[in-house]
């Protein structure tokens, strides 16, 4: 009997493999979250800037809106219009399938 040992091949430590897999995953996830937050902040600033730009141009008066709606309704009553249905131009004279002339 000989007292020699067989050299073992070096095995990768499982903890280091986890680091090689999870490290890039968390790095990519972190970069994605940062990009999403930056895009959200830019969009919010753009919308706020647009709202502040357009707000002085628009003044809402509910009483004025009601008066305009009443005027539109009154003007529609005096102005008769002919309204055709969507089927009016597509209706054709239909011939019965079993039209037997005797």
UniProtKB/Swiss-Prot annotation:
The keyword Transmembrane applies. Keywords: Glycoprotein, Membrane, Transmembrane, Transmembrane helix. It is found in: Membrane. InterPro entries: SMIM29. The keyword Glycoprotein applies. One of its GO terms (cellular component) is membrane. It is a single-pass membrane protein. The chain crosses the membrane at residues 21-41. Glycans are attached at residue 3. This is Small integral membrane protein 29. It comes from Mus musculus. The gene is Smim29.
